[in-house]
A protein has these predicted regions:
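Mg2+-dependent phosphoryl-transfer active-site scaffold
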Residues: 1-232
Length: 232
């Protein structure tokens, strides 16, 4: 199941995942931890299908945090394993956030450290918004898009949703996609132009400059050196 990208490259991530699943199945069958169900598909459906996995297992998340899982998919690098120890994910969403946030790099406080700070005490996020002088309504709008991500705009989809939101920028899909492409290509000149346009769009929609400044400096800027898509 090869995936072709825009640049003509091929991703072998799907093949890698399938290999891990098959090896795990063979080892579990060998040790009589699971039973063969008559076919590969039936055995997979009974024991490995996402619908039958317990994605709330505290034991599993503890193993991830402690580094006891040697080769978790896309989380096997030293950087990812260290991030797991630091973030200590307690939900599958937090694992997904870890996978995106380790790729983000900024000047000053790093996104992973900001996320850990917010996770330990979400009031820290509100304190940061208050430092920019955001109103209660502006904070509510940020909660709408960012509270599920613990106060961090870590994916292109969230960035676009904020731009499109009629109660924030009302920038439309065209401008949101233009901003996304600028970030995705890491073109600093295009990013600067997109930011300038964002300030104008926000102003035209009756928003304060400090609100636009917070969104650009504290949220969108997290992706200016690397942009990641929301995991499915």
């Amino acid at each position: 199941m090869l995936k072709y990208h825009e640049n003509g490259g091929i991703s072998f991530l799907s093949i890698s995942a399938l290999g891990r699943i098959r090896e795990a199945m063979d080892l579990l069958l060998e040790d009589n931890k699971i039973e063969w169900q008559g076919s590969l598909r039936a055995t997979y459906d009974k024991y490995f299908h996402p619908d039958v996995l317990d994605l709330t297992s505290k034991e599993m998340f503890d193993m991830l945090s402690n580094g006891d899982i040697f080769d978790a998919f896309q989380m096997s690098s030293l950087v990812a394993r260290n991030a797991m120890r630091k973030i200590k994910p307690e939900t599958f969403d937090e694992v997904a956030i870890t996978n995106t946030i380790i790729r983000l790099q900024t000047d000053g406080e790093q996104p992973i450290d900001k996320f850990v700070r917010y996770k330990k005490d979400i009031q820290e996020w509100y304190n940061d918004m208050n430092k920019y002088g955001l109103s209660k309504e502006e904070i509510r709008l940020m909660e709408k898009h960012l509270l599920p991500r613990t106060g961090i705009c870590d994916t292109q989809e969230i960035l676009m949703n904020i731009i499109i939101d009629p109660d924030i920028a009302d920038g439309g899909l065209g401008f949101a996609n233009k901003f996304r492409k600028s970030v995705g290509k890491k073109d600093q000149k295009k990013i600067a132009n997109a930011c300038s346009e964002f300030y104008e769009v926000m102003k035209s929609n009756g928003q304060s400059e400090k609100f636009a400044q917070y969104i650009i400096e504290e949220q969108f800027a997290l992706q200016f050196n690397y942009a990641f898509s929301l995991p499915l």
